[in-house]
Amino acid sequence: MNLLTTRIDLDAIAHNTRLLKNRVGAAKLMAVVKADGYNHGMDRVAPVMAANGADAFGVATIAEALALRATGITTPILCWIWSPEQDWAAAVEAGIDLAVISPRHARVLVDAPPTSRAIRVSVKVDTALHRSGVDEQDWDAVFTLLRDCGHIEVTGLFTHLSCADEPGNPETDHQAETFRRAIDRARALGLEVPENHLCNSPATLTRPDLHMDMVRPGVALYGLEPIPGLDHGLRPAMTWAGAITVVKPIRKGEGTSYGLTWRAEADGFVAVVPAGYADGVPRAAQDHLRVHVNGHDYPQVGRVCMDQFVIFLGDNPHGVTAGDEAVIFGGTGMSATELADALATINYEVICRPTGRTVRDYTGEGK
């Protein structure tokens, strides 16, 4: 028995992958599995995505890319956060595509001695986010440098949208216009760029006019709606739950947890859930959690501790007892989006939180 578990529904992963693939028509689907598959377990979810329509995969780091390749994934893998000081040649030997995210990165690859296989790259152009990416004033130099290098194969260009989760924000169209200008400039200089992509999850779902050659969704694959208030039929794949360890009485006026910041307004019972800030429950979650036990919701009370938090059961009319499952989010509990709203954050962060002593349990067959 595990005291703290994230249940990952592989059938939900399969459903979401198919749904996205069906929405994008002829465009390819690059499934983003960075951060260990958004904390769902990259080694388990990536094969399901591959079997249900993913044409390629995107990760952040070289270590993630190599780990993904080691699972047996044979489709293209793009890595977009790396340093020239790393052993990037190991990624090339493993057939990993590297993102050119600055002129320096381009120069390092061009000046490198030939490897046993061509270095495959995708050029990330900065179209407004002002993060990683080649700035417009450097396009000509970088495009020409790559064009003239015999041991580099350019797969295309990509960029990242800053405001796609805000439908109607003109910045998305401004970025798309800049991106098209980058594609046109590359081709005018004689650089072949066959596969170009800019759509993240919200743009994949709401901007079919921007699908281009490939889309690059992330959070939607895991069943979370990237645009507040919309419903695209996605199925959340993660449920985070703990097994109650203690149920005990509390008298009116008595407090619980550090500082006794909460006191019972009437006699009743409290229960202890074995999840704390060491496991990803933020200390700031105090008084924001509604925990689901046996078909009923109960408020979290008092301060969140390192290893546990407390819920108030009232007079415990439903007979909650030690060993019962307490759902923190997902499944029958609060959705990740509801919890994110309560914590003034985003659902992306919420699903990345279960860590520490949390054990993953997989359900479904990925079909």
UniProtKB/Swiss-Prot annotation:
Gene3D superfamilies xref list: Alanine racemase, Lyase, Ornithine Decarboxylase, Chain A, domain 1
Modified residues (N6-(pyridoxal phosphate)lysine): 34
GO molecular function: alanine racemase activity; pyridoxal phosphate binding
GO biological process: D-alanine biosynthetic process; peptidoglycan biosynthetic process
SMART domains (alphabetical): Ala_racemase_C (SM01005)
Species whose genome carries this gene: Corynebacterium efficiens (strain DSM 44549 / YS-314 / AJ 12310 / JCM 11189 / NBRC 100395)
HAMAP family: Ala_racemase
EC supergroup of this enzyme: isomerase
Swiss-Prot/TrEMBL catalytic activity: L-alanine = D-alanine
InterPro entries: Ala_racemase (IPR000821), Ala_racemase/Decarboxylase_C (IPR009006), Ala_racemase_C (IPR011079), Ala_racemase_N (IPR001608), PLP-binding_barrel (IPR029066)
Name of the protein: Alanine racemase
The protein's role, per its UniProt record: Catalyzes the interconversion of L-alanine and D-alanine. May also act on other amino acids.
Family: Belongs to the alanine racemase family.
Cofactors required: pyridoxal 5'-phosphate
Pathway involvement of the protein, from the record: Amino-acid biosynthesis; D-alanine biosynthesis; D-alanine from L-alanine: step 1/1
Residues the record lists as binding substrate: 131, 306
